[in-house]
Design a protein with these regions (language model features):
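Alpha-helical scaffold elements lining the catalytic groove of polysaccharide deacetylases
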Residues: 5, 51-77, 90-144, 159-160
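Loop/helix-junction capping segments adjacent to catalytic residues or to phosphate/diphosphate-binding pockets
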Residues: 1, 26-30, 123-126, 155-158
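Terminal accessory/targeting
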Residues: 4-18, 75, 117, 130-131, ...
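Residue-level recognition of the N-termini of beta-strands and the immediately preceding loop/turn
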Residues: 80-82, 145-146
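Active-site beta->alpha N-cap acidic-glycine motif
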Residues: 1-80, 163, 167, 180-181
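A cross-domain feature marking catalytic cores of carbohydrate-active enzymes
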Residues: 19-24, 45-47, 85-88, 117-118, ...
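Conserved beta-strand segments of alpha/beta enzyme cores
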Residues: 42, 112, 172-174
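Short low-complexity, flexible loop/linker segments enriched in glycine and/or proline
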Residues: 33-36, 58-61, 129-132, 187-191
Length: 191
């Protein structure tokens, strides 16, 4: 429901976005998933099942989960995916011991991961639309290039999307691609 509302708004505003999808949700909502691709949005993989303990148990478990999501996206949405986003971001408390190996193996296969440098902070808790917009403004920090994290499953995010877009007239909103230099958290294993 929220994703369809977001897609309606993006279509009305002629804006393309990037959706990092969860394979489990693609299987549960195939028509909405197909619509994302059919309307020209960039599709990336988030995961298949959003379970940090399972995902980050090992590099193999992460890649197995990714492959299942990838196969689902290819089968249902009809797109080949090259972008992915780590659940919790590339640097989090769950993946410290496996992140480096995951990144190396995924990059060897030609995948690119994106993190974010601004956020609605909508992943946890029930927030009102105005709070989400304030979070976006506070975390954008007048950067020239912003990758804003938002979650389509959150009702307030869908409800405030038009106002959120209007709050940033100075930005050209466009989807992530393989040609854009990715925003990535500092690779803690690199100096």
């Amino acid at each position: 429901k929220n994703t369809d509302l977001i897609l309606d708004i993006l279509k009305e505003r002629d804006i393309k976005a990037t959706f990092f999808v969860i394979g489990e949700y693609v299987r549960k909502h195939p028509e909405t998933a197909k619509r994302i691709a059919q309307e020209g949005h960039t599709v990336g993989i988030h995961c298949d099942v959003h379970d940090y303990n399972l995902l980050y148990k090992s590099a193999d478990s992460y890649i197995e989960d990714f492959q299942k999501a990838y196969d689902t996206v290819r089968e249902i949405m009809g797109v080949e995916v090259k972008l992915f986003r780590f659940p919790g971001g590339s640097v989090n408390a769950y993946n410290k011991t496996v992140c480096r190996e995951i990144v190396e193996r995924m990059e060897e296969q030609g995948y690119i991961y994106f993190d974010w440098n601004a956020s609605l902070e909508d992943a946890v808790g029930e927030k009102q639309a105005q709070e989400l917009i304030a979070n976006a403004k506070a975390t954008t920090l007048d950067r020239k290039k912003v990758v804003l994290l938002a979650h389509d499953r959150v009702t307030a995010t869908a409800q405030c999307l038009n106002e959120l877009i209007d709050a940033f007239p100075e930005y050209q909103m466009k989807p992530l691609t393989t040609k854009i230099e990715p925003v990535q958290f500092k690779r803690f294993w690199e100096k």
